[in-house]
Amino acid sequence: MSETATLEVASLSHPGMVRTHNEDTVFVDGDAGIAVLADGMGGYNAGEVASGIAVNVVSNGMMPELKSGRELSKIDIGSGLTHGALLLQQQIASANKGIYEAAQARPECAGMGTTIVAAVFCGNRVSIGHIGDSRCYRLRGE
C-alpha cells in the first residue's frame, strides 16, 4: 500500500520589532518541490543583497534538475544522502561563494551575510539544508 503525500508550502516574513526594513528573500515552487528562505543578517551591511544572492543561486541551480525528471530521491552510496540533498548542498556552497565574491567586489557589501533554509521534495523524501537560525517546520495531521 502506497500513500500519496500532499505538499503544502507557506511562507511568512516580517521585519520584526526593531528593524525598519525586511532583509528576507523567499522562493517557493510547490510544483517543482522547492522552498528557499534566506534572512539577511541584520546589523551587517547589505543583508538584503546577501539573502537575494543566496535564494537566486540556490533556486536557479536547483530548478533545472527538479524539472529534468532525474530521480533525485535515490540514495548516493558514498555519502548516504539523496541526490537531491547532494545537489542542495552544492547549491548552498555556490551561494556562499557568490556572496563572498560580491562582498569582495563591492565595498558597500563588505561583511554581508545571510542565513538560509531550503527544503527539496523528491518522491517521498524531503531534504532540508540550513545555515544559521532560520527555521523549517514539518507539520502533520489536522
Walk through the language-model features, giving the residues of each.
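PP2C/PPM-type serine/threonine phosphatase catalytic domain
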Residues: 1-142
